UniProtKB/Swiss-Prot annotation:
Is associated with a DNA binding complex that binds to the G box, a well-characterized cis-acting DNA regulatory element found in plant genes. Belongs to the 14-3-3 family. GO terms for cellular component: cytoplasm. It comes from Oryza sativa subsp. japonica. One of its GO terms (biological process) is protein localization. Gene3D superfamilies: 14-3-3 domain. InterPro entries: 14-3-3, 14-3-3_dom_sf, 14-3-3_domain. This is Putative 14-3-3-like protein GF14-H. It holds the Pfam family 14-3-3. PANTHER family: 14-3-3 PROTEIN.
Length: 230
């Protein structure tokens, strides 16, 4: 059995056993083989990290809620804050590791438009997770990076469809859907400072509509508004 196949099989086994930390380690090994991941492999990569980060995000939200219920400076509040910072350190470590792997091993090796789209979306998600608990300049940097990734993956999907299908109309529809999904992700995140990002998303959508109009002879979708919440 080839090493790549063995690692994938072990990752599947770890998933079945709900040992997600092990699953992540196996998929990190695969990513560092510098291969263009198959659909199955990239899903395993994503699921492993999503399970790992998901549990910690849930813990952070619980601690954040508990901290808000105590008086500032009280001993219980100090204890909660210290424990919350420990969880934040774990979140930061996981996010930074995912982003590093995507930047070094995943995007450079992605030969298909589908893979490029997948990893840009994942990149945007993990910068957004960083922004959820960060403050100050760290929060702004994570927010900006998340926006850049979310801007990139709808465009990557559009160009991929144009290349494969030679269908500007269909490509525009799928790219619009991708952009709408990214907008929904940002709206639901409730992260302070994302309103500026939403304005930039609106500009991106307008540019996409204009470009598509040129390709299709002037016909554009009328449903081009981004709904901003919160």
């Amino acid at each position: 059995m080839k090493e790549r196949e063995k690692v994938v099989r072990l990752a599947k086994l770890a998933e079945q056993a709900e040992r997600y930390d092990d699953m992540v380690e196996f998929m990190k090994t695969l990513a560092r083989m510098d291969v263009d991941m198959s659909a199955e492999e990239r899903l395993l990569f994503s699921v492993g990290f999503k399970k790992t980060i998901g549990a910690r995000r849930a813990s952070w939200r619980i601690l954040e809620s508990l901290e808000q219920k105590v008086t500032a400076g009280d001993q219980p509040g100090v204890t909660i804050n210290g424990y919350k910072k420990k969880v934040e350190d774990e979140l930061r470590a996981v996010c930074n590791e995912v982003l590093s792997i995507i930047a070094i091993h995943c995007l450079p090796l992605a030969n298909s438009g589908e893979n490029v789209v997948f990893f840009y979306k994942m990149k945007g998600d993990y910068y957004r997770y960083l922004a959820e608990f960060s403050t100050g300049t760290e929060k702004k940097a994570a927010t900006d990076q998340s926006l850049m990734a979310y801007q990139a993956w709808p465009c990557a999907q559009l160009f991929s469809l144009l290349e494969i299908m030679n269908s500007p109309e269909r490509a525009s529809q799928v790219a619009k859907q991708a952009l709408d999904e990214a907008t929904a992700e940002i709206n639901s995140a409730g992260v302070e400072g994302y309103k500026d990002s939403m304005l930039m998303m609106q500009l991106l959508k307008e540019n996409l509509a204009l470009w598509t109009s040129e390709l299709t002879g002037g016909e554009t979708s009328k449903d081009d508004d981004v709904v901003m919440e919160g």
